[in-house]
């Protein structure tokens, strides 16, 4: 799928342009104002700021890891001339930014006082909007008459989870491949059943430089048969110990791959030579 048609050239424009308008419509009807707080490894931040710019009832604050997003995306976030948009550089990784955001939302008193809301894929509206293009793509590719598979470059697991949710809704998807870069915790988990945290390594695909994928909890919820207490226990143990292992972990129709920085330029060159089509480093991680 070509998902670079939005104003910031990120696939997240498809969902966030809708979500920004939904926020504006509902808030105006209610006479309310919200403070949106989000974390980004690059593409979410620029797409969210663009979607919320100049919205009268929204203040948006986006945290990004200093020196770990692409120069283009940093400029997209920091050069918007809009009084309600705020981009904040954090000394750390995307996971550090995400932990700060989660901490704010977990502080009930602070959350209510500031009327916090989210545009990250923590917000279910983001995932719902992304389900749509999987349905459209599958139908155009011949579903249900022919099996359709998707290989998805994956960082925070929101996009590929939208594909999985589409399958759960009845879309005849044959296979989903979770493409990772050198920050390969998801690849290792699908291969071994063990989640084991490592340091975040800067790569040629910076929007995927993530170790703890928020949306993976949603997949675990289904794997653990809807037992939310069990999911909480697993994730708390994982965050405190840095690892968690399942016996016989398997998600039907899902697998994973890992692409290193050495392989990314080779894949880009091979795709160009064979198809005369130029893919970006993130797409290369799922090719």
Q: What name fits each language-model region?
A:
Residues 1-287:
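PLP-dependent amino-acid enzyme catalytic core
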């Amino acid at each position: 799928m070509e998902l670079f048609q939005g104003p910031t050239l990120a696939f997240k424009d498809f969902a966030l342009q809708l979500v920004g308008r939904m926020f504006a419509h509902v808030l105006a009807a209610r006479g309310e104002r919200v403070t949106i707080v989000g974390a980004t490894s690059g593409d979410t931040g620029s797409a969210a700021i663009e979607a919320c710019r100049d919205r009268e009832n929204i203040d948006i604050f986006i945290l990004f890891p200093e020196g770990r997003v692409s120069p283009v995306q940093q400029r997209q976030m920091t050069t918007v001339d809009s009084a309600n948009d705020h981009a904040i550089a954090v000394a750390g990784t995307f996971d550090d930014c995400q932990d700060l955001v989660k901490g704010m939302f977990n502080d009930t008193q602070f959350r209510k006082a500031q009327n916090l809301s989210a545009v990250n894929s923590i917000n279910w509206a983001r995932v719902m909007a992304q389900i749509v293009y999987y349905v459209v793509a599958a139908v155009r590719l011949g579903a249900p008459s022919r099996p359709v598979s998707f290989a998805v470059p994956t960082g925070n697991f929101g996009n590929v989870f939208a594909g999985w949710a589409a399958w759960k809704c009845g879309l005849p998807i044959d296979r989903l491949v979770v493409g990772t870069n050198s920050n390969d915790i998801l690849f290792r988990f699908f291969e071994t059943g063990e989640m084991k945290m490592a340091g975040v390594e800067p790569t040629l695909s910076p929007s995927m430089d993530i170790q703890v994928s928020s949306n993976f909890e949603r997949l675990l919820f289904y794997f653990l048969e809807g037992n939310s207490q069990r999911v909480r226990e697993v994730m708390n143990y994982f965050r405190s110990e840095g690892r968690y292992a399942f016996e016989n972990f398997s998600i039907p129709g899902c697998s994973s791959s890992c692409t290193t920085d050495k392989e990314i330029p080779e894949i880009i060159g091979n795709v160009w030579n064979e198809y005369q089509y130029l893919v970006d480093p993130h797409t290369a991680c799922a090719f």
